[in-house]
């Protein structure tokens, strides 16, 4: 079949790769001049199935109120009247129950574990390299209360069969020797030996090169204007360079996905969650991390990428604003400075921001839609890199009529359709001219 993939971030490129490997004729279109130049450009770098957790969790509403008065809060809500934001936040708060958290985390871990396996197979098959390391990840706790609260996550990990190690202070330093100078700040940690790290931008670019060799066509600098519909199906993609037609369409445009389908009657509950990162050149390797260290206090990941350190995280609800907030840079620098002081100079770092496409329940939307020839691969939030290979393969299997290797019914748009049907919303409307 002829397939058009909208978006060339890591989700779009992995989708294109697996679709091409399944024998389809694939074209990818993106407004940028190359792959992974938006949200996939400088993310935190960790591939962490075990840490795949929804932001909607018990206790988060109370924590959010406390964070409002902290200078270095992990979550910031910029004041602005926005109905889409209000609706999304209300749905997120509704998922902050213990029962919802357990369900959401379990299915996120399912997809993330599968994705890591797919990535390993892809690496073995192609020899692709992207500053990857397979040395696990370590979540460090500065307070005993944080360590105690991790018990709920540990229960889910145990139920899902994910290997883990609960470490004391000395165990954390043994796993990450660079923490020796800051050991007094740590009370313990949770290590997941099966997790990985890698440069998402480097991976996406190299996979795009391989996809091109496999027959995929990439069209750069093409702005997508609208999806056109006729007879209950997508008939074309309208761009500033003309119309493209295909048998199937895959929407992988991250936070911008809802804008592409709203006029078709699809109400995607995806909202941008702004994140930040610093990329620091290593000056003292003995003080640098070996893999990824998650700072639970600031919700920051500190990742080793070759001869660089990527410090990424935080969450800012600010709509589609991409301006750089200097206070967020202070928070990232504070986290890495306190845990890995002297490893590099944060003042000379590359400061970046991107928009993560977040769903209220944390689980991405991967699969079919009520429109027969339109598929979604979006809403991965902070876990797009972690879930990319598995999501791309899942989309290819669904389009190709193959049974997926994992349960996928609860990963798609259908879980959000009950409310839409109750409200009497149409499943498909003609595209506006």
UniProtKB/Swiss-Prot annotation:
Q: Supply the alphabetized keyword list.
A: FAD, Flavoprotein, Oxidoreductase
GO cellular-component term (any): cytoplasm
Against InterPro entries, the record matches this protein to: DadA, FAD-dep_OxRdtase, FAD/NAD-bd_sf
Task: From the UniProt record, list the reaction(s) this protein catalyses.
Answer: a D-alpha-amino acid + A + H2O = a 2-oxocarboxylate + AH2 + NH4(+)
Where on this chain does FAD bind? 3-17
This protein's pathway reads: Amino-acid degradation; D-alanine degradation; NH(3) and pyruvate from D-alanine: step 1/1
Task: From the UniProt record, give one GO term of the biological process aspect.
Answer: D-alanine catabolic process
Q: What class of enzyme is it?
A: oxidoreductase
Q: Record's superkingdom? A: Bacteria
The job of this chain, per UniProt, is described as: Oxidative deamination of D-amino acids.
Q: What family does the database annotate?
A: Belongs to the DadA oxidoreductase family.
Name of the protein in its database record: D-amino acid dehydrogenase
Per the UniProt entry, what species is this protein from, by scientific name? Paracoccus denitrificans (strain Pd 1222)
């Amino acid at each position: 079949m002829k397939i058009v993939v909208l978006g060339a971030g890591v989700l779009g490129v992995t989708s294109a790769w697996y679709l091409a490997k399944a024998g389809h004729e694939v074209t990818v279109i993106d407004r940028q001049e190359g792959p992974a130049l938006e949200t996939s450009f400088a993310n935190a770098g960790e591939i962490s199935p075990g840490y795949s957790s929804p932001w909607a969790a018990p206790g988060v509403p109370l924590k959010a109120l406390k964070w409002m008065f902290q200078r270095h809060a992990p979550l910031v809500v910029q004041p602005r009247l926005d109905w889409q934001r209000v609706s999304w936040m209300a749905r997120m708060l509704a998922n902050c129950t213990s029962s919802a958290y357990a369900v959401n985390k379990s299915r996120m871990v399912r997809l993330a574990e599968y994705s890591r396996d797919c990535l390993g197979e892809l690496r073995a098959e192609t020899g692709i390299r992207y500053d990857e390391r397979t040395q696990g990840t370590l979540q460090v706790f500065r307070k005993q209360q944080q360590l105690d609260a991790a018990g709920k996550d540990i229960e889910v990990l145990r139920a899902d069969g994910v290997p883990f190690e609960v470490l004391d202070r000395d165990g954390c330093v043994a796993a990450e020797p660079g923490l020796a100078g800051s050991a007094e700040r740590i009370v313990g940690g949770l290590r997941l030996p099966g997790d990985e790290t890698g440069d998402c931008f480097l991976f996406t670019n190299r996979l795009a090169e391989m996809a091109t060799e496999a027959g995929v066509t990439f069209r750069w600098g093409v702005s997508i204007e609208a999806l056109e519909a006729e007879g209950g199906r997508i008939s074309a993609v309208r761009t500033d360079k003309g119309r493209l037609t295909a048998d199937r369409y895959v929407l992988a445009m991250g936070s911008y996905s809802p804008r592409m389908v709203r006029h078709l009657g699809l109400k995607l509950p995806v909202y941008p969650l702004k994140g930040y990162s610093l990329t620091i050149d290593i000056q003292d390797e003995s003080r640098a991390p070996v893999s990824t260290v998650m700072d639970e206090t600031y919700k920051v990941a500190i990742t080793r990428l070759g001869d660089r350190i990527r410090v990424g995280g935080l969450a800012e609800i600010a709509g589609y604003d991409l301006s750089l907030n200097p206070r967020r840079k202070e928070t990232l620098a504070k986290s890495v400075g306190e845990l890995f002081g002297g490893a590099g100079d944060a003042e000379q770092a590359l400061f970046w921001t991107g928009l993560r496409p977040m769903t209220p329940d944390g689980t991405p939307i991967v699969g079919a839609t009520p429109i027969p020839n339109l598929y979604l691969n979006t809403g991965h939030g902070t876990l797009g890199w972690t879930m990319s290979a598995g999501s791309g393969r899942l989309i290819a299997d669904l389009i190709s009529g193959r049974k997926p290797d994992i349960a996928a019914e609860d990963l798609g748009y259908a879980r959000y359709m009950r409310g839409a049907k109750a409200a009497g919303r149409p499943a498909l409307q003609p595209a506006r001219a």
